[in-house]
């Protein structure tokens, strides 16, 4: 049997250790895993889904159900394997998000949203003792870093997709409406409002709050932020990331900075709470699998059973399975940083995500529309107003309805 997932080193280790335990219990089953970091992963899996040679069990992004199996053709309806996989362990809302084309195409591993993480070791060096709680705090941090630490130090760095999410967070906070209709993907914002959002991101770069993408690329090419020398050594002192990424970023810091890693506060940029929560990932069984019952048994082991759930812990986020969460907590396997971040996200976010927002043509590193938009801004190739046209054309091309 085969299984695939993406993630960082600690997630790879958890999956592999859990698989060893599963094989010890099921000696007639051998599991071959395939795994890597996120960069380029969706393109690889999309090709496998189209070719019909994807793994039996796949860790999937929520929007993949819409992108690759909107007709229910790629993934097994898990209601048909409820004898092997206990579907009663999940809340209806989380399960409903994975119900597409009249089919329970995956079970949610965890729910997630975005939050700020800060390296307070560097902030303290800049004379700042509290995490930023407002836009004014962010702008003041940019000024302090530049003046006290120098041009090479920044309060945070965000890649293009991260900038898009923060821009939407800002607009939702200011205007109190979802980015787009969560069912029809009809955009809820005007060109002027979006230009305002892009200008907000530009102001963070201009104010030395965020590193210019051109500067980042020249030093790191396409290296992920947590693997960059600037993050590891504390020159980049903040990120806006999924709550489940806490371990990946904290463990990457060198010894001089590790103790400074801190879960920040959600920032209100207007009268409303911005941001969304979503199914962070699911586990699905491909319709090309020849061992569907065994695949369902493996998923149940990883997410619902004591041995599996206590090993997986919070490596894929805070478990959405009620049984899995209890077993992980009892084993002390839920990382406090992830739990703290998730609790803050879930208490704050109220907006819904539409299924096209994470379309790979929009969010892909290096080639996506979001990348093009924010590259153009940082390279000075477009004004915010011009960048809006690029963004809307790209959104329309993947199926958004532009009002």
Predicted features by range, described:
Residues 1-72, 80-87, 130, 220-221, ...:
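Conserved N-terminal structural module of periplasmic/extracytoplasmic solute-binding proteins
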Residues 13, 74-75, 244-251, 281-364, ...:
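Mature extracytoplasmic/periplasmic domains
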Residues 24, 32, 102, 126, ...:
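Extracytoplasmic/periplasmic substrate-recognition and gating elements
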Residues 35-44, 63, 135-139, 214-232:
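Short helix-initiation/N-cap motifs at beta->coil->alpha
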Residues 61-113, 260-266, 335-336:
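Hinge/lid segment of periplasmic solute-binding proteins
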Residues 101, 105-109, 114, 139-194:
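Extracytoplasmic/periplasmic solute-binding protein
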Residues 142-143, 186-219:
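Glycine-centered hinge/linker elements that transmit conformational signals in sensory
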Residues 340-396:
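C-terminal capping/gating helix-and-loop segments adjacent to ligand/active sites or protein-protein/ligand interfaces
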């Amino acid at each position: 049997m085969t299984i695939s997932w993406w993630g960082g080193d600690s997630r790879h280790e958890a999956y592999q250790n859990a698989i060893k335990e599963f094989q010890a219990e099921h000696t007639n089953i051998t599991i071959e895993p395939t795994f890597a970091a996120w960069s380029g992963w969706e393109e690889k899996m999309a090709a496998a889904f189209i070719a019909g040679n994807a793994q039996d069990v796949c860790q999937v992004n929520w929007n993949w159900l819409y992108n690759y199996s909107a007709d229910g053709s790629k993934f097994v309806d898990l209601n048909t394997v409820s004898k092997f996989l206990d579907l009663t362990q999940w809340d209806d809302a989380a399960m409903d998000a994975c119900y597409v084309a009249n089919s329970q195409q995956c079970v949610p591993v965890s729910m997630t949203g975005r939050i700020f993480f800060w390296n307070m070791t560097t902030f303290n060096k800049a004379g700042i003792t509290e995490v930023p709680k407002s836009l004014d705090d962010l702008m003041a941090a940019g000024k302090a870093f530049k003046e006290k630490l120098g041009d090479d130090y920044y309060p945070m760095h965000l890649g293009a997709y991260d900038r898009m999410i923060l821009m939407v967070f800002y607009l939702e906070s200011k205007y109190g409406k979802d980015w787009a209709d969560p069912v029809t993907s009809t955009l809820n914002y005007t060109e002027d409002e979006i230009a305002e959002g892009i200008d907000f991101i530009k102001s963070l770069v201009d104010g030395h709050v965020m590193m210019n993408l051109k500067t980042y690329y020249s030093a790191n090419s396409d290296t992920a932020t947590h693997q960059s020398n600037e993050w590891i050594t504390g020159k980049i002192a903040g990120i806006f990331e999924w709550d489940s990424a806490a371990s990946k970023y904290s463990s990457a810091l060198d010894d001089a900075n590790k103790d400074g890693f801190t879960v920040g506060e959600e920032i209100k940029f207007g009268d409303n709470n911005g941001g969304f929560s979503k199914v962070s990932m699911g586990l699905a069984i491909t319709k090309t699998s020849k061992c569907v019952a065994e695949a369902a048994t493996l998923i149940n082991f990883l997410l619902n059973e004591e041995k599996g759930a206590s090993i997986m812990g919070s490596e894929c986020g805070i478990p959405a399975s009620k049984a899995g969460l209890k077993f992980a907590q009892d084993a002390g396997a839920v990382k406090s940083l992830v739990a703290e971040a998730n609790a803050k996200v879930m208490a704050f976010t109220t907006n819904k995500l539409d299924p096209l927002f994470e379309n790979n043509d929009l969010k892909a590193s290096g080639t996506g529309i979001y990348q093009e938009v924010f590259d153009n801004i940082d390279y000075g190739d477009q004004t915010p107003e011009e960048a809006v046209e690029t963004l809307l054309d790209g959104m329309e091309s993947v199926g958004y309805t532009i009002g």
